[in-house]
Amino acid sequence: MNIHDKDTLHECTSCQMCAAVCPKQAICIHLNQDGFYRPVIDGEKCVDCGICKSVCYKYANIPEYKDVDKLLNYAASAKSDAVVSGTTSGGLGDILCEQLVNEGYLCVGVTYNTEKNIAVDTVAKTREESISFRGSKYIQSYTYNAFKSIVDNHLNDKVAVFGTPCHIFAIDKYLKKRKKRDNFVLIDIYCHGCPSMNVWKRYLEYVNGKTHEKSYDYVSFRSKAYGWGSYYVAQMKKGGKTLFTSPKINDKFYTLFFSDVLLNESCYDCKLRSTMDSTDIRIGDFWGKAYLKNTRGVSLVTVNHASEKGKALFEKVKDKITYKQHPATDCISYQSWGLKYDIESELRKKLFASLADPRQTIEDTVRFFWQSRSLKARLKQKAKNFILLMPRPVVAFLKGLV
């Protein structure tokens, strides 16, 4: 009995917790041909103990979450300009992390490894080590080493884990099984889904061709070069010099990411983005009409009403932030909560084949994607792009009409 059992309810999330909890080290994590982290089991080492299966989302029956109206939702921004400018939205993830480190918590979060060009979960013991957690990383993270460290070394320590809902679900399951949940604070994000690593790899080839570089000191997935809110802008720096800033519109990576065609299969009907049963706090951008004119950055902080730890932690950081409480209708309806994406299986196969073909570039893949869209969809995107190129106040006004 292990994670290769076929009685599944869902697809693999690539959380990698199965490998971290395996007492026989019978599970290794590899990128599959489509660019997703997957477990590989050594049948000679596996003793069918079932621990891996006990933390796996594939076999979990997730009940419908009925307490949405009880959740505590806040629009929040750090008072510190340095924190806000160095983060993706309002800096609340960084503020919460700083508070937890100061309380003696180890903090687990995602950093971008500029040598390997991958996102990696690491364990931070100091404030300085946690600074690299700042900023969104819109690719899968290699979590195994950090999660293994939690399982082997830190179950009796105070630990805070920042991750996607599927990461937090798996950790929460294991901690409750071991009766160690009280030692932990779990914070997840409003998650759109994770794209294939093959998209990011081919995108970097495209960027390298523009910059004539192969590595960078700093990679930002969502720069505020044009302000917060309307634009997804990648930026690469080296030696303090900005070498690449993607355009406001038609960026190759974000075109494929937000097409939703190349997400991890578990993301299409993910139940975990629509529940708070495993997490203490959920954070993200505060989308919606309330802050359309804000260019600085506003975070959405959703505190689990049933989590005393979550409520206490938010109270402790209130002196470092500006905040305002909102009903769920102002914010959660603009997130991925409750969404189910359509799987375009044939197009998905063709786009993966294009990404795998060394004779083709990511520009070819994007061109093929748009050729697959209807005339109506292409015209709609052109209209959206036209609006985004207008002055920021005009963009905010037009969005407010929708």
Predicted regions and their residues:
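Gly/Ser/Thr-rich loops at beta-strand to alpha-helix junctions
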Residues: 87-91, 114, 161-171, 193-195
